[in-house]
């Protein structure tokens, strides 16, 4: 079984963990509808990506759904 040869110092441990931090999300504003969206992803509210409609969004009439 593998056993460490010597103790890992606090400095070496910290240097190894320097790249482990989580990065907060960086949302961008959709140029079509103005909602926040993830960069390089289709806008979930309007379905546009790169100023083109990629996913057709169905128009919902609230008056018909209530009846």
UniProtKB/Swiss-Prot annotation:
It holds the Pfam family Ribosomal_L32p. Coiled coil: none annotated. One of its GO terms (biological process) is translation. Keywords: Ribonucleoprotein, Ribosomal protein. Signal peptide: none annotated. SUPFAM superfamilies: Zn-binding ribosomal proteins. GO terms for cellular component: large ribosomal subunit. It comes from the Bacteria. InterPro entries: Ribosomal_bL32, Ribosomal_bL32_bact, Ribosomal_zn-bd. One of its GO terms (molecular function) is structural constituent of ribosome. HAMAP family: Ribosomal_bL32. Belongs to the bacterial ribosomal protein bL32 family. This is Large ribosomal subunit protein bL32. It comes from Jannaschia sp. (strain CCS1).
